[in-house]
Amino acid sequence: VGLILSSAQNPLMNEFCVEQNIPFEVLNHMESDAYLNVCQKHEINWVILAGFLKKIPEAFIEAFPNRIINIHPALLPRFGGKGMYGKHVHEAVSKSTVHFSGITVHLVNEEFDKGMILAQYAFSLKNRSSTEAIESHVRILEMKYFPRVIESVIQAEIIE
């Protein structure tokens, strides 16, 4: 990990980064030049998003073609797009007629949640149909699988 970049102050993350000797920077506005400059300064090759809710500017995407990975807390493409994050996604899943939910790890492109899907992990909604139960199980899957997918994609360089 060459850099952790946040859109908000985060004392716990800052403390973790100091302990791990990882640079930590806060940029609270999405200006592609500022993000590009910080990534270039730290010689970043891959960008991993987690909990990043803003649209990524095209100039930033162009600077990291097929090298921006995001996680989505539902199975795409059905529960994706602008406004589909956090509890909004879990509420939509809970109110739907689907029998499964899960997570999607995907590349980022110019459209919300439309990049190439790298991996999906699903679970049955049987006995887990409340928003809270869905959210809880999604978090378990995120913690278990997101690091594994990132590692395998970066090590294998499967994206060309």
Spans of features found by a protein language model:
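One-carbon transfer enzymes
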Residues: 1-160
